[in-house]
Amino acid sequence: MVTHENSNIDITGKSLQCLKPGAWLNDEVINVYLGLLKERERQEPQKFLRCHFFNTFFYKSLTRGGYNYKSVRRWTSQRKLGYCLLECDKIFVPIHKEVHWCLAVINKKDEKFQYLDSLRGRDPCVMPILVSFADM
């Protein structure tokens, strides 16, 4: 077990095996890394943009049965987050595509949406869903 002292973020050595060459990245490692990015921002807010990092389950829940904001509404409340999501400069949304991870970014600061895929894939469904979510 590895623990990040400042944030109470734990991860097992077994989960970290996915970082070896040729291994498949898992959701636990992605969620831990996103948590560490948020912790870094909290510790030094003057150095970083205000960001929100959704966990790896968010997009799947948002899109279950089509666009379904109700299924994630509680994840986005100011009470739950401790800050207003709409005041963030960037909102990061990890997306799992069967055996591949992509990242969508709602970049409010620059007023654009980004879809990042190391395999240069495209998903015409992602952007309309995120536009609907951003217009909440």
Show the residue positions of the predicted features.
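Cysteine protease catalytic domains with a Cys-His-Asp triad
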Residues: M1-C102, I106-K112
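"Short basic amphipathic alpha-helical interaction patches in structured regions
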Residues: N107, S118-L119, L130
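Catalytic Cys-His active-site segments of thiol-dependent hydrolases/isopeptidases
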Residues: F113-R122
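E2/UBC-UEV (E2-variant) core
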Residues: D123-M136
